[in-house]
UniProtKB/Swiss-Prot annotation:
Species: Brucella canis (strain ATCC 23365 / NCTC 10854 / RM-666)
GO-annotated molecular function: structural constituent of ribosome
Stretches assigned to coiled coil: none
GO biological processes: translation
Similarity comment text for this entry: Belongs to the bacterial ribosomal protein bL17 family.
Lineage, opening ranks: Bacteria, Pseudomonadati, Pseudomonadota, Alphaproteobacteria, Hyphomicrobiales
HAMAP family (UniProt xref): Ribosomal_bL17
Cellular component GO terms, alphabetical: cytosolic large ribosomal subunit
The protein's name in its UniProt record: Large ribosomal subunit protein bL17
NCBIfam families assigned to the protein according to its UniProt record, in alphabetical order: L17
SUPFAM superfamilies associated with the record: Prokaryotic ribosomal protein L17 (SSF64263)
Keywords for this protein: Ribonucleoprotein, Ribosomal protein
Quaternary structure (record): Part of the 50S ribosomal subunit. Contacts protein L32.
Length: 142
């Protein structure tokens, strides 16, 4: 019997839900910490945990499965190289969900989703690199 084995629909179609979870998983892998609503956080946990387990498996089939799930080759490379090595000795429990109060506009419960033992410098790394590149380009132009 499959009683109680459902999932949250989150008022979205199946394709929208699948795309949203793929985007959230990609953002979490890239930044290693995201802020979202609590129901979305609870739904994204098993998806990302399975992706990290695929990364730990490390073979070509696992890599192709991860690419089909998150659609970004650079993030899959990070998943298989950086994150898989970081969690090589840990059997599950790669994600932490912490309650973060309520959103101002609609009072929705918020949660911080982050990797356990995360790299603090990963959040905002692309933004910092972009700002430094723009500053260097301006210095060269001047």
């Amino acid at each position: 019997m499959r009683h109680g084995n459902g999932y949250r629909k989150l008022n979205r179609t199946a394709s929208h839900r699948k795309a949203m979870f793929a985007n959230m998983a990609a953002s979490l892998i890239e930044h290693e910490q995201i802020v979202t609503t609590l129901p979305k956080a609870k739904e994204i946990r098993p998806i990302v945990e399975k992706l990290v387990t695929l990364g730990k498996r490390g073979d070509l089939h696992a890599r192709r499965q991860a690419i089909s799930a998150i659609r970004d080759v650079k993030l899959v490379a990070k998943l298989f190289d950086t994150l898989a090595a970081r969690y090589a000795t840990r059997n599950g429990g790669y994600i932490r969900i912490m309650k973060a109060g309520f959103r101002a506009g609609d009072n929705a419960p918020l949660a911080v989703v982050e990797f356990v033992e995360r790299d603090v410098d990963a959040k905002g790394k692309a933004d910092r690199a972009r700002v430094e590149a723009e500053a260097a380009a301006e210095a060269d132009a001047a």
